[in-house]
Amino acid sequence: MANRGPSYGLSREVQEKIEQKYDADLENKLVDWIILQCAEDIEHPPPGRAHFQKWLMDGTVLCKLINSLYPPGQEPIPKISESKMAFKQMEQISQFLKAAETYGVRTTDIFQTVDLWEGKDMAAVQRTLMALGSVAVTKDDGCYRGEPSWFHRKAQQNRRGFSEEQLRQGQNVIGLQMGSNKGASQAGMTGYGMPRQIM
């Protein structure tokens, strides 16, 4: 963490719970996908959450990733600078987040800049990258590079069209889900609260 001291008490417990959500196997899969997707000379980071954070922290890898998901000439982030200044790095991370939202990642799946830059919640960073990969696989526009089975495909709209005659036929059928229209009924039942008449 950049400028934060150690946490104690309840905040320590919360931080430990957040850190338990981080998945090392998922980290390896995401690193492999990012390197394959960017198709550039991006060095493979050593394993571990701290190295993964350091690898993504300046925002250049993330910006290259989102640019690689667009056709050449349509990249959302035209200028990527490898700067050592903190505000430039945080600006690049926020540019990536805006571009990811424009690409189709839901706002609920997007991490906050401090989650990555200060290493507060690297599991949220993993969730965002997984959501980005899922959207890329679902779009199937030829820009995704990698194994399609690495990410789940999001559900697509599948509209059905029925003619008026088919709709009328459906109204005449009593479905099995409704049960039988024969047998026991409530005929002869008395109202609620009335005594039962036994003769």
UniProtKB/Swiss-Prot annotation:
GO MF annotation: an example: actin filament binding
GO cellular component: actin cytoskeleton; nucleus; synapse
Calponin-like repeat residue numbers: 174-199
InterPro entries: Calponin-like, Calponin_repeat, CH_dom, CH_dom_sf, SM22_calponin
Tissue and organ expression note: Widely expressed in the brain. Expression is increased in the superior frontal cortex of alcoholics, but not in the motor cortex or cerebellum.
Family annotation (PROSITE patterns): CALPONIN_1, CALPONIN_2, CH
Biological process annotations from GO: actin filament organization; central nervous system development; negative regulation of transcription by RNA polymerase II
Residues recorded as bearing Phosphoserine in the entry: 163
Domain Calponin-homology (CH) span(s) in chain numbering: 24-136
Keywords associated with the record: Phosphoprotein
Region described as Disordered: spans on this chain: 176-199
Annotated Polar residues bias: 176-188
SUPFAM superfamilies: Calponin-homology domain, CH-domain
Xref: Pfam families: Calponin (PF00402), CH (PF00307)
Family: Belongs to the calponin family.
Descriptive protein name: Transgelin-3
Source organism: Homo sapiens (Human)
UniProt lineage: Eukaryota, Metazoa, Chordata, Craniata, Vertebrata
